[in-house]
Amino acid sequence: MKLFNTLTRQKEEFKPLVPGQVSMYVCGPTVYNYIHIGNARSAIAFDTIRRYFEYKGYKVNYVSNFTDVDDKMINEAGAEGTTVPELAERYIQAFLEDTRALNIEEATLHPRATHEIPAIIDFIQTLIDKGYAYEADGDVYYRAKKFADYGHLSDQNIDQLEEGASQHVNDEEQGRKEDPIDFALWKGQKAADEIAWDSPWGKGRPGWHIECSVMSTKYLGDTLDIHGGGQDLEFPHHENEIAQSEAKTGKKFVNYWLHNGFVTVGKDEEKMSKSLHNFVTVYDILKNVDPQVLRFFMASVQYRSQINYSEENLEQAANILGRFKNTLEGINYRLADATEGLPDPDLAKLVTETTAKFEAAMDDDFNVQNALTAIYEALPAVNSNANAEKADKESLRLFAKKLAAWLSVFGLDVDKLLAKEAGDDDAVIEELVAQRTEARKNKDWAKSDELRDQLKEMGVVLKDTPQGTRWSRE
């Protein structure tokens, strides 16, 4: 299996620290609002990656944090007239509800920054003791230039970074920082009513970057197999995590850095973000869109690529999902009949070849498009066999099992996909289908067509097969 490592800008063979196990940390949300689909994209991308590791037999220790104290949270809590903890609790629960709806597996652990304050203080003190950090008027800053590899992950040199930093430092910070490029590890309390904790440097709260260094190393060890997040976190967040963690431990922090692409909107494909006010929340989308369709839409694009959110692209995803559903229904319908099966060597070979193609694609940095193409190209032959006079039932049964496993990697629940919503008119539909079957048996084509038209007006789609007529709702 090969992964594209952002640190080296190339694909590398995946070699876990512990054979058969994967340690994986993914930056979670800052919980001051409902998540939008840009946030969901990251959660779905890394859930798909996790699921494929599990498909391959790995045990995955998946840690994803909640940033539950932050400038944005303080501002939002003030605007709403509530407290930061109350705001955090509300949106953590909303996040969990949204991710459950999208069939995102629960993390092994969801640490919260505010629950790790003692560990954060100890981590910062170690950096001070080693000369990598310094206190200034109640704040603590990291000496970025002291870390020799600073800028490596984002492929920037110190001069470039310093020039950019000097343009964003306010006068107050300038007076405290030794260098514009230095970043905050601890922020002193600015107002008496601002959320804060006691520390050796006075009351205050942690900086964003130190939170993830502490939580990832505390729960996964000094060196991680994989660290993931959005491409917008590459710098400064992940760059700073490396500087902090490796300065403290003296060890390589992460072996494989994975970054997912953005969700864009509109004809200009503008990045979706809260700051640009062009976002749509998962909560609002799911009022009108099937969760499985949204999940499949997000999971069906390779994680490093951008996704353009549009009604047309959602509809296309729904159509592809419908093809998979029809194939599974056709197989199940055929397996349920009493006809004797007939082995088909070509179909058996196709199942084996499709499995190999699917896994080869996913082993190539999780190339989901090629994996889906392999499945999609197998459907005509599978459908043809399912409708044949004598089907290869064993191969069909195996393909259905494989397809369920493949779709599960994409986060789809086959049982839910195949579940029919019971309607008050089901019995009426069954009776009309039976009457049409009898009319066809008697070659009363006019009556058959009349019944088909009547069923169509009821929103019922018919499919005639050698084994009988199947129906579904539009």
From Swiss-Prot:
- Chief subcellular site? cytoplasm
- Compartment annotation: Cytoplasm
| The keyword Aminoacyl-tRNA synthetase appears for this protein | yes
Renumbered to this chain, motif 'HIGH' region spans: 29-39
Which note does the record give on the cofactor?
A: Binds 1 zinc ion per subunit.
Q: Which GO terms describe its cellular component?
A: cytosol
**Gene Ontology annotations of biological process type:** cysteinyl-tRNA aminoacylation
Named cofactor requirement(s): Zn(2+)
GO MF assignments? ATP binding; cysteine-tRNA ligase activity; zinc ion binding
Q: Annotated motif 'KMSKS' region: location in the chain?
A: 271-275
Q: Which reaction does it catalyse?
A: tRNA(Cys) + L-cysteine + ATP = L-cysteinyl-tRNA(Cys) + AMP + diphosphate
The entry describes its oligomerization and partners as:
Monomer.
The name this protein carries in UniProt is Cysteine--tRNA ligase
